[in-house]
């Protein structure tokens, strides 16, 4: 497998906050985050440039808090801070694995991380550093999926790798419906029309407008990130006509 050439040169990996929590359901599981760091290290070893966007749902969910009566903008800002906590945790895990890493935040906090500067982010990637984008888009009402699409476009990534709990996109929730059918390939419009759980509509539309493919795959199987980068047919690929 190591003799294979990667099919993508620059990727944006989208991780959910829940992925970092592992089976405990909340917070950050050190073993899980170390495992993710090791997978990213392998991909860097193939010569691939890696950027990461992480959600914050393992610490705080803005939409859930807003549904409970909290001001939506304030709740979303709390969610953005949660993503920065996750970003710092992943940075530490990556650097312990020997991978130089930079965190850039959409909300300035210079004592903690660099502010998001597009050209600087690209320069880090060219120097084989992992760049983690924290703080979402920096604006309330936008999800971290939308932040992933936006940053992928800005850094001219070849693909978004969306890591999930299941092994692709299904017609229904496979955990609840045993008749759910898995899709190997989808078009952006199919995702939007059928309301499939890939990314939210804003994020999907951004990818569609800029013809950026999305690969949805299962994170919990070791080696899957590397398999996607090498072009193996796992998960579901979403692209244009």
Swiss-Prot record:
Activity regulation details: Allosterically activated by GTP. Inhibited by UTP.
Compartment list: Cytoplasm
Entry EC number(s): 2.7.4.22
Catalysed conversion reaction: UMP + ATP = UDP + ADP
Residues bound to UMP: 56, 76, 137-144
Pfam families cross-referenced by the UniProt entry: AA_kinase
Keyword list, A-Z: Allosteric enzyme, ATP-binding, Cytoplasm, Kinase, Nucleotide-binding, Pyrimidine biosynthesis, Transferase
Annotated region (Involved in allosteric activation by GTP), positions in chain: 22-27
One Gene Ontology MF term: ATP binding
Residue positions binding ATP: 14-17, 57, 61, 164, 170, 173
GO cellular component: cytosol
Domain of life: Bacteria
Pathway this chain belongs to: Pyrimidine metabolism; CTP biosynthesis via de novo pathway; UDP from UMP (UMPK route): step 1/1
GO BP term (any one): 'de novo' CTP biosynthetic process
InterPro entries per the UniProt record, alphabetical: AceGlu_kinase-like_sf, Asp/Glu/Uridylate_kinase, Uridylate_kinase, Uridylate_kinase_bac
Assembly behavior: Homohexamer.
PANTHER family membership: URIDYLATE KINASE, URIDYLATE KINASE PUMPKIN, CHLOROPLASTIC
Family to which the UniProt record says this protein belongs: Belongs to the UMP kinase family.
Function text: Catalyzes the reversible phosphorylation of UMP to UDP.
Protein name: Uridylate kinase
Origin organism lineage: Bacteria, Pseudomonadati, Thermodesulfobacteriota, Desulfuromonadia, Desulfuromonadales
């Amino acid at each position: 497998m190591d003799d294979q050439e990667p099919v993508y040169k620059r990727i944006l990996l989208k991780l959910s906050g829940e992925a970092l929590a592992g089976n405990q359901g909340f917070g950050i599981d050190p073993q899980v985050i170390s495992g993710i760091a090791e997978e990213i290290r392998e991909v860097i070893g193939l010569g691939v440039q890696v950027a990461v966007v992480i959600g914050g749902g393992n610490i705080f969910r803005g939409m859930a808090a807003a549904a409970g009566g909290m001001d939506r903008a304030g709740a979303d800002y709390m969610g953005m801070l949660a993503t920065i906590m996750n970003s710092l945790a992943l940075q530490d895990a990556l650097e312990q694995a020997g991978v130089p890493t930079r965190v850039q935040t959409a909300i300035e906090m210079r004592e903690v991380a660099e502010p998001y500067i597009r050209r600087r982010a690209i320069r880090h990637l060219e120097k084989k550093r992992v760049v983690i984008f924290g703080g979402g888009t920096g604006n309330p009402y936008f999800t971290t999926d939308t932040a992933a699409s936006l940053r992928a476009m800005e850094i001219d990534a070849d693909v978004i790798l969306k890591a999930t709990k299941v092994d692709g996109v299904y017609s229904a929730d496979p955990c609840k419906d045993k008749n759910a059918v898995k899709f190997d390939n989808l078009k952006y419009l199919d995702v939007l029309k059928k309301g499939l759980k890939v990314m939210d509509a804003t994020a999907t539309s951004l990818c569609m407008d800029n013809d950026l493919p999305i690969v949805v795959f299962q994170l919990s199987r070791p080696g899957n990130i590397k398999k996607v980068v090498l072009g193996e047919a796992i998960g579901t690929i979403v692209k244009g006509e």
